[in-house]
C-alpha cells in the first residue's frame, strides 16, 4: 500500500514509519508513506503557508497555491487511481467498516489541514472524500491521518504477525473484543479462566464469542442494535445476561 501525506509537519509521521507494526510494514516493503510539505511549494522568503479568510473572523486558512501544488506533486508521484482524502471534523466518521473500505485502496493521499482549515474551493476541486475520527477539534489533521494509516495498514497481508489478528480485533464483526490473558496464571489472586487452559479449541472459541457479545452488551449496547445475531450468538448472549444479572 502506498500513502502520500500532505502536511506542514511531515516529521510527525516518523511515529508511523519508524515504530511498531507500521514501522515494520515500512521496513518490509509492505507499506510506503511519502510526505509533502506545502512549505516546499512557496516562493516568498518567509515560506508563507497561511492567509486571512475573506469576511474576517478569527484565525487563518492554509494558502491555496502551496497546498494545491503539494497535492499535485503527490498525485504525480502516485500515478493513476490514488484517492485524495481530507481529514476534517466535517467528514464521515471513521469506524471499522470505513477502515475496511479504505483498506481496499492501494493508493491514498491524505491531506492534513492546519489553522482554521482550507479554502472550500480546494476541497471541491482536489478532494475525493472527507473523513473524521470523531466529533472534537484537534490542532491539525496529522493525528487523524496517523490513526487512519495505522488502522488500514493492519489489513495489508503480511503486516500482522498472525493472519487472524486483524479479523479478531474489536469492531471487525461489529462486536467488542473479548478479554485476553497471558502469564502468570494467577495474578494477585485473579486466575486465568480455566477454559483458556483446557486446550479445547471449540470451547475456547465459544467462550471468547460469549465474552465478546457480553462485553458489547455491557459497554456498547447500541452496537448490538445494528447486528443480525446468529442463533448461536443469541444463545450465548442470553447465557451471559443470565450470569450477569444485577
Curated annotation (Swiss-Prot):
Localization in the cell: Cytoplasm
PANTHER family found in the cross-reference section: TRNA (GUANINE-N(1)-)-METHYLTRANSFERASE
UniProt-recorded Gene Ontology molecular function terms: tRNA (guanine(37)-N1)-methyltransferase activity
Record family assignment: Belongs to the RNA methyltransferase TrmD family.
Keyword vocabulary terms for this entry: Cytoplasm, Methyltransferase, S-adenosyl-L-methionine, Transferase, tRNA processing
Catalysed reactions, semicolon-separated: guanosine(37) in tRNA + S-adenosyl-L-methionine = N(1)-methylguanosine(37) in tRNA + S-adenosyl-L-homocysteine + H(+)
Entry protein name: tRNA (guanine-N(1)-)-methyltransferase
Protein EC: 2.1.1.228
Binding site for S-adenosyl-L-methionine: 113, 133-138
Organism encoding this protein: Yersinia pestis
Pfam families: tRNA_m1G_MT
SUPFAM superfamilies membership: alpha/beta knot (SSF75217)
GO cellular component, one term: cytosol
Xref: HAMAP family: TrmD (MF_00605)
UniProt cross-references to CDD domains, sorted A to Z: TrmD-like (cd18080)
Subunit structure as annotated in this protein's UniProt entry: Homodimer.
Domain of life of the organism encoding this protein: Bacteria
Bridged cysteine pairs (disulfide): none
GO terms under biological process: tRNA N1-guanine methylation
Gene3D superfamilies according to UniProt: 3.40.1280.10, tRNA(m1g37)methyltransferase, domain 2
Its biological purpose: Specifically methylates guanosine-37 in various tRNAs.
